[in-house]
């Protein structure tokens, strides 16, 4: 078992050793390689400037991921350990026997805190070609990778789609032109929603106004599905599909 720890920013000199000490009993022999990234954010005014992310490669090809933020290093390590156990419950056979029956009581992770609107910027633009999969497979990725949303191409309707949680055990899928093909027999049921046509500045203005952690929309000029979302540094990032658009004539 190998736990690689990388750091960024000013952190305690023993941070990597403390993280390994807490995670080693949890990961055991079923996780041959895990990567942890510890970061202290430099933006002033953040209440939770410490961020940790773990990516666990499990035997059998499975992966799980978790990301947490905290005000202190001790809280960060504790939250990371608890969240890692919670994520590994998706594959309970990899957990030590004493942890399989452990019920975590953490509430859902809090969304990143935002800087005041005047100080926010879109600091990252990322494009990806969505992978074709079913809605159920997309939910599995969403949960295992601890994503707030997941961009994919729905296998049957062949539409770019974004899936998000809409409550405990409930999910919503956004599409530019909602098509229920492939969603009729899903369990749990999935709500289908339209990704409204919008410009990027309009999406930024909505998040500035509402303080919401994410805005899903269809970019007005390209017809591509996008997600504008809050980063842990208090700024915004933009994720968009780079797949070819067959019909980008705008809303109905």
Give, region by region, the residue ranges found by the protein language model.
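N-terminal, polar/charged subdomain of small-to-medium soluble alpha/beta proteins
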Residues: 1-252
């Amino acid at each position: 078992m190998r736990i690689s720890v990388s750091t960024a920013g000013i952190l305690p000199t023993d941070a990597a050793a403390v993280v390994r000490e807490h995670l080693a009993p949890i990961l055991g022999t079923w996780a041959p390689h895990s990567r942890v990234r510890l970061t202290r954010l430099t933006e002033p005014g953040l209440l939770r400037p410490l961020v940790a992310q773990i990516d666990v490669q499990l035997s059998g090809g499975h992966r799980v991921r978790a990301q947490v933020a905290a005000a202190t290093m001790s809280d960060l390590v504790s939250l990371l350990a608890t969240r890692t156990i919670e994520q590994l419950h998706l594959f309970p056979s990899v957990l030590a026997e004493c942890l399989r029956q452990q019920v975590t009581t953490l509430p859902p992770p809090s969304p990143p805190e935002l800087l005041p609107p005047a100080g926010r910027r879109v600091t990252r633009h990322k494009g990806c070609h969505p992978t074709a999969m079913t809605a159920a497979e997309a939910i599995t990725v969403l949960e295992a990778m601890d994503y707030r949303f997941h961009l994919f191409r729905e296998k049957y309707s062949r539409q770019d789609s974004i899936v998000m949680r809409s409550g405990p055990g409930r999910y919503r899928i956004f599409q530019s032109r909602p098509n229920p093909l492939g969603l009729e027999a899903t369990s749990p049921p999935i709500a289908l929603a339209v990704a409204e046509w919008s410009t990027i500045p309009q999406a930024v203005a909505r998040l500035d106004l509402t303080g919401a952690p994410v805005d899903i929309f269809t970019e007005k000029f390209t017809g591509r599905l996008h997600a504008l979302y809050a980063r842990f540094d208090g700024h915004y990032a933009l994720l968009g599909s780079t797949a070819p658009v067959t019909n980008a004539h705008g809303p109905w």
